[in-house]
Amino acid sequence: MTDSATVFSSSPFVVHLVNTYLFMMQAQGILIRDNMRTIGAQVYEQVVRSAYAKRNSSVNDSDYPLDLNHSETFLQTTTFLPEDFTYFANHACPERLPSMKGPIAINMSEIGMDAIHELFSEDPTIKLGGHWKPSDCIPRWKVAILIPFRNRHEHLPVLLRHLIPMLQRQRLQFAFYVVEQVGTQPFNRAMLFNVGFQEAMKDLDWDCLIFHDVDHIPESDRNYYGCGQMPRHFATKLDKYMYLLPYTEFFGGVSGLTVEQFRKINGFPNAFWGWGGEDDDLWNRVQNAGYSVSRPEGDTGKYKSIPHHHRGEVQFLGRYALLRKSKERQGLDGLNNLNYFANITYDALYKNITVNLTPELAQVTEY
């Protein structure tokens, strides 16, 4: 007779529970460690933050440079404008508007694109392709939202349902660019971003670029989608990671750079076929160019993710070899070796850029 205890202990379900328990214990350990910092260390860190605030702050004035990101316990308080604050159409839009309340009511239920069109059809200020700009003030940033895409038709409407109202409350000028990969090659998220950048710049003199995964839903409208003096990592606390930063150099999900910054780092690498590694390479490029990375304070950077488990996409096994040569490749692989042929169509809420990507379109010379 089979020992029932042996069968139970070897069950994949039990193994999964054990792994989940160990991860939760590790996460709790991290939280305990962070909360055990001494008062002296906190005071010292606040002094250093204050000394560096002017040099490293972005236009949002509420973020912190990565090299000072040791704890969020002692962050400066962000003040938002009162409800009765008056601003004028010929003045720059404030960055901390009364309309930005903080937590967003997240609705992850599936919705068709037709329903999204109907939802925003009564807003005449949204132009073809999803272009919008405020009329009651001058937007501080002209923001191109670039979304890499393949077979996520149920995710895009959910994202737009949340992002459009949020960006309108933030009084940013914006438009959406959905960059869709077709063909048989593995998904190349980074190359799609490069294509989206090139196409977006043909439409308008954008000054801020947001690189946004379609399955990341922001939980706070105070996560201001403008750019700054440093590249910005917006999605710092993702629910599937228990709202913890997976590792210090994590730069995935949602990030933002000015056009000047993006050109200086030569964009994303084109050589990452399959998922994984391209965000780490972007981090390296940012550091190699002499930039730090800013992040939202507190819980402002919280996001919910739509589960998908990289359906149909393969993991890029060669990413570590490429990452070891990030610095050598940076000037050879990116915007400057990009070639593509795009098919452009317009939706009421976004511009669709369809490309069939192959490695031959971004060949790299020897380094």
Region annotations inferred by a language model:
Residues 184, 188-192, 197-199, 208-212, ...:
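Conserved catalytic core of nucleotide-sugar-dependent glycosyltransferases
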Residues 141-147, 163, 175-178, 196:
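Hydrophobic targeting segments
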Residues 134-140, 152, 159-173:
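Short, acidic, metal-binding catalytic loop of nucleotide-sugar glycosyltransferases
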Residues 16, 20, 40-46, 58-93, ...:
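C-terminal catalytic/acceptor-binding lobe
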